[in-house]
Amino acid sequence: IRLAQLNNNKNNEWVLEKFFAHTIEGLPENASVLEHPDKIGDELKIALQKSKIETTNAAIAIPVTSAIIRVVTAPLMTDEELGKAIDTDSLWENLVQLTDNLNDYSIFHQVINRDKERNTMDILFVASKLSDINGYTSIIKKGGLNAVIIDVKCFALKSAVDQMNQIKGSIEESNLTAVLEFGLDENYVMILYENNPIITDIFIRSQDRNTLLKSDNQEEMEGLVRRYMTQVKQAIQDFETKYEKRIRNLKVVSNLPNVDSYLGSFRKNLANTGFNLFDPISEVKVPAQLSEGLKLANRSYLSTVIGLAF
């Protein structure tokens, strides 16, 4: 469990007021949060007491695996026409073939591109299972918090990246930033282009997870990297072809202890492209009492909680 509280000071600088990480013990390996609501709720209560965070309003992130995220192409429409098509439920049924009932999902959409020449438009479609959302909010409530914002994890990451770009004043990166989440649970490329997120899932097999977790077998690691990079390369090429923009660097977010050894392999597989760990607090003021605990070689996995706190 990670808790963070950020505030703006008089100089309009972001300050990390509170930060606390709490390790949960006694759960089986590969256990999910929703399978152990009482245990997680109790642990959250303990974490809150130790963190000394006083506000009860919280922003929480649900895993990308709990959501369906797709960029779909539709005939060109005005916002009014799009609204009518959504109201009748016909649009999503035609564009997104879901096996479940649409009423079981909370749906968010955003038009990310209109192409008048081809008479088409690209829409970001995000559907989160209501049962999962209710499960997470009840755990948060049990822990003593009120979930006022519920975001899919990748959008919390987007918030962290956007803020870092804004603080740095990097106009180029504000217009185009590519992010790669790489780990045991979440794997996707997210390209932020003119503030629109274009997300592509990266598939890894169950045996690949074992390789990431335990393996020191060079052959297995190289095979995993090849398969992984083929998908990353494809996602980048698809974007570059469509938008005629070049991606030179990817900010990497990962919770893997040995992520550095993989980054070296990524660079060899995708020459002329940089892979660097993202630091979500590089431009944030960190008080002395917190700085020691945050001197980490890899701070990228703090991106979600920091992005939520902004």
Give the positions of each predicted feature.
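Small-residue (GG/TT-enriched) beta-loop-alpha framework at ligand/catalytic clefts
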Residues: I1-F19, E54, I60, R114-V232
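N-terminal phosphate-binding loop and adjacent alpha-helix
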Residues: K18-Q49, R209-R227, V232-I236, G293
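Phosphate/pyrophosphate-binding loops at sites that engage ATP/ADP/AMP, CoA/4′-phosphopantetheine
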Residues: L44-N57, K233-N249
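Conserved phosphate-binding/catalytic loops in two-lobed NTP-binding clefts
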Residues: G264-S303
